Amino acid sequence: MTLAAIFAAAMMSFTACEETKPDNGGTTTDENLCPDCGKDPCECPEEYASPITIDGDFADWDALDASKVAVATCSADAKYTALKTVKVYADEVYINVLMEVDADQITSDSPIDIYLNTDNSDNPGNQNWLGQSGQDVLLEGAYYSEGAVVSFDPGLYPYTGSDQEVEWTWDVENPLLAEGNGLASGAGTVAKYELAILIELLNGVELADTFGFGITVSQNWEPVGLLPNDTVTDENTNGAAKFLEVTINK
């Protein structure tokens, strides 16, 4: 071997063993650097992990900070009573919903309608046909169909009615997102069911830090459950109540 070859081999060996000085000023070898951010220790952001898993096991709801969960319970004098309770927990990724249902009232296909008052405004207009006001978008899909519980994967529809009017007016021909595109998922039983709405798929719908939430469940397109609800009166024949206020946990 020539002297030049010996020298080249020695230099290659030295380079392979040479320590690398990272940005933090310490010393480390290449094998200790994070392959993603190139730092030691790793400075990659923590991967998001939802506190709620949509699997029909509701124990993770009990572990939530109760002050972060919005709850509505059926009024004793309500008109539509199939929905007994609804709990809503929202973070920056999901709107999670847990509902308890009177299963005796669910015997056929059961669509869920979820109404979002995106800015939680007190505007008395934009009322749905049951009298809840402030609605901006509708999420509509089934949770019980053809005799079995199914995963909730709704369509997303903008409200197109006149301001200050009580109308059931949605642009169903031009949904913001058609049903079956992964906007939400759900699991559970007829009597107890959880679902999660993926906020990034709301397609341009922006939520204020606190937004309004309403929900109905129907049988053959006739409502049997409504939350929030209230006592039926001559002025409030459907027993509607103001939307539940949900604050996003950031």
Predicted features, each with a name:
Residues M1-A4:
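Bacterial N-terminal signal peptides that target proteins for export
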Residues A10-S50:
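Bacterial Sec-dependent N-terminal signal peptides
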Residues A90-N96, T107:
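Extended extracellular/luminal ectodomain segments enriched in beta-structured repeat modules
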Residues A103-D109, L202-L207:
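A short beta-turn/strand-edge loop motif at beta-sheet boundaries
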